[in-house]
């Protein structure tokens, strides 16, 4: 689970919500659990059904920039749920509008926060209520860090360090 997903888990818990974290990697699901996720589900063909067995989703926030998550979200959502898309897949995304209309789903896009929301998030972080998983990488290893990011191997956020940090 990437950095945005990790923050989302924590913010949802602070808001009193039940959180079901979804990811393709077991280690990232384990991290989500330590950050407060109530349940963790492996992102595979049965994920939507598994989420329904847990009571279904009243809302889904998708940070993954891939189209493969769309059918899973539709299967996971209860009637009148809201789906928030923040990850932007390359190319077009096709789906059956019938499911959205018939079940009264709301699909929203979100790309940024405003100053007030950022200030609130920073205050939560400064108070230790929201934690980031940070991977410090020397600038000389920027290419390796980018390869790891593209391969989905990075948990949280990667921060490039300049010079000697010892």
Where are these regions (language model features)?
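N-terminal Rossmann-like NAD(P) cofactor-binding module of classical short-chain dehydrogenase/reductase
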Residues: 58-61, 84
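C-terminal hydrophobic helical "lid"/dimerization subdomain
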Residues: 71, 115-166
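Mid-domain Rossmann-like dinucleotide-binding core that forms the NAD(H)/NADP(H) cofactor-binding site
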Residues: 1-45, 50
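Helix N-cap at the beta1-alpha1 junction of Rossmann-like dinucleotide-binding domains, i.e.
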Residues: 26-27, 67, 90
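Helix-to-beta-strand junctions that scaffold the AdoMet/dcAdoMet cofactor pocket
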Residues: 77-79
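Rossmann-fold NAD(P)-binding glycine/threonine-rich loop
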Residues: 87-103, 115-123
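Short glycine-centered segments of the SAM/dcSAM-binding site in methyltransferase folds
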Residues: 81-83, 106
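A short acidic, Gly/Pro-enriched loop at the edge of an enzyme's catalytic core
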Residues: 51-58
């Amino acid at each position: 689970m990437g950095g945005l997903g990790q923050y989302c888990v924590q913010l949802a818990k602070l808001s009193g919500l039940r959180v079901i974290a979804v990811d393709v990697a077991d280690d990232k699901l384990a991290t989500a659990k330590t950050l407060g996720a109530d349940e963790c589900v492996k992102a595979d063909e049965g994920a939507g059904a598994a989420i329904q067995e847990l009571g279904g989703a009243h809302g889904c926030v998708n940070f993954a920039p891939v189209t493969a998550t769309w059918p899973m979200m539709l299967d996971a959502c209860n009637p009148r749920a809201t789906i928030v898309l923040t990850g932007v897949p390359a190319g077009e995304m096709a789906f059956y509008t019938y499911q959205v209309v018939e079940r009264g789903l709301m699909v929203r896009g979100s790309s940024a926060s405003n100053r007030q929301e950022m200030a609130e998030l920073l205050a939560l972080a400064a108070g230790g209520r929201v934690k980031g998983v940070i991977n410090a990488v020397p600038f000389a290893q920027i290419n390796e860090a980018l390869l790891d990011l593209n391969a989905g191997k990075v948990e949280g956020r990667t921060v490039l360090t300049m010079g000697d940090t010892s």
